[in-house]
Design a protein with these regions (language model features):
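Active-site glycine-centered loops adjacent to acidic/histidine catalytic or metal-binding residues
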Residues: 11, 43, 99, 187-188
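N-terminal active-site segment of His-dependent metallophosphoesterases
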Residues: 1-78
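Conserved catalytic scaffold of divalent metal-dependent phosphoesterases
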Residues: 72-185
Length: 188
């Protein structure tokens, strides 16, 4: 069995109010490590424009813009994939997971279907996950997808109980092992 190398990252929260230079640095690391596959555990897009908690604060809403959120995310994904040099690299396999911040798009459409539209509305397709990832795992049954690679389970978060809330606690790793009995990696 050949050993595989993975680069796993999560919760990049690309946001128009913050520079995307960090994605250049992560991209350089990715090409330096030259992994077999890369796993993005979700929340790559902050999607502050669809944050329902900010509706109480009008000054927070004014600075938010859906188009800027989408453009910032796609620029970040592009920066991750730029080669730092002309050296030959083997192309890694890119695996992505939908996080709760990306899921804000689907929630907004479910709340008000009139918002949906590929050209003039909001749409999950604007994230271009089919372009950025070889394999992408969307939420299923209102919870993050779980996928196994090389004997390890990956998800944006693992649910605790039947309510779909994220497993948490003082000793999160211990809770994951105790409840899942399996090697697991999550973001959130």
């Amino acid at each position: 069995m050949t050993a595989k190398t993975a680069v796993v990252f999560s919760c990049a929260h690309s946001d128009p109010s913050t520079g995307n230079e960090r994605f250049d640095w992560l991209g350089e690391l990715i090409y330096e490590v030259n992994p077999s596959y890369i796993i993005d555990l979700g929340d790559g897009a902050d999607m502050r424009s669809l944050n329902t908690f900010d509706t109480r604060y009008p000054e927070a809403i004014v600075s938010q813009n859906y188009e800027q959120d989408i453009n910032c995310y796609n620029e970040a994904m592009d920066r991750l994939r730029k080669k730092p040099s002309e050296r030959k690299y083997k192309r890694p396999y890119w695996i992505g997971f939908e996080g709760n911040h990306e899921n804000r798009i689907k929630k907004a459409i479910a709340h008000d279907p009139r918002l949906q539209g590929d050209k003039y509305g909001i749409s999950f397709s604007h994230l271009q996950t089919d372009h950025w990832f070889d394999e992408y795992h969307e939420y299923t049954n209102s919870a993050p997808a779980i996928a196994d690679y090389d004997g390890i389970s990956y998800a944006h978060f693992f649910s605790s109980g039947n309510y779909g809330t994220a497993m948490s606690g003082l000793h999160h790793a211990n809770s994951l092992l105790a409840n899942r009995n399996h090697s697991s990696t999550c973001g959130h």
